[in-house]
């Protein structure tokens, strides 16, 4: 497994549009069209960078020309690479970060920006144990803890490829005092490992895999770094 993260730097509208135009040649027509529909430039940047990141990783790992990489969608909506059925990947973005995980087995990744939220949402979407864990945290830690649990749950759901219909309250994410992350799953689910990462103090990130362990290292890139790599392809 490999995990990558790209941090977007603040740009004024002129330079943001310039960066978007620099990224467009490296993505599919469908992704370009999707980026053009976004109201906010940062959403377009994140969307384009996600696909560019995966295409570049595939190019480096398999020497497959970026323009020949074809993405298809499985019945559950999860994207796959037509030419490399054994290649699994997942993307997530929030705020200033775009993150991706790749492996030879299904993988899920999620990143969440810690921001003010009505914690009552946890009573609706969390299991009873998760909700009680959240309420037991000191008031000043509850928002961060909420996003810890949310990122773990999202990473698992993205691993399964079943989407939000899986039922967020049907399984339980736990985070021990020493930072050990675990999932208690329904009986029909195979065991999996979830790991959290301290990528940025303002964010929570988690990766989920059915392998014995997740990657320990996250390779951090910048948009400028990625564009430099692309220009050398």
From Swiss-Prot:
Enzyme class: transferase
Signal peptide start and end residues: none
Catalyzed reaction equations: apo-[peptidyl-carrier protein] + CoA = holo-[peptidyl-carrier protein] + adenosine 3',5'-bisphosphate + H(+)
Key words, A-Z: Antibiotic biosynthesis, Magnesium, Metal-binding, Transferase
InterPro entries with a match to the protein in the record: 4-PPantetheinyl_Trfase_dom, 4-PPantetheinyl_Trfase_dom_sf, AASDHPPT_N, P-Pant_transferase_sf, Ppantetheine-prot_Trfase_dom
Gene Ontology CC, one term: cytosol
Cofactor(s) needed by this chain: Mg(2+)
Gene Ontology molecular function, alphabetical: holo-[acyl-carrier-protein] synthase activity; magnesium ion binding
Keyword ATP-binding: no
GO biological process, one term: antibiotic biosynthetic process
Pfam families: AASDHPPT_N, ACPS
Residues the record lists as binding Mg(2+): 110, 112, 154
Family membership noted in the UniProt record: Belongs to the P-Pant transferase superfamily. Gsp/Sfp/HetI/AcpT family.
Function field: Probably activates the peptidyl carrier protein (PCP) domains of surfactin synthetase by transferring the 4'-phosphopantetheinyl moiety of coenzyme A (CoA) to a serine residue. Required for the production of the lipopeptide antibiotic, surfactin.
Identification of the protein by name: 4'-phosphopantetheinyl transferase psf-1
Biological classification of the source: Bacteria, Bacillati, Bacillota, Bacilli, Bacillales
Gene that encodes the chain: psf-1
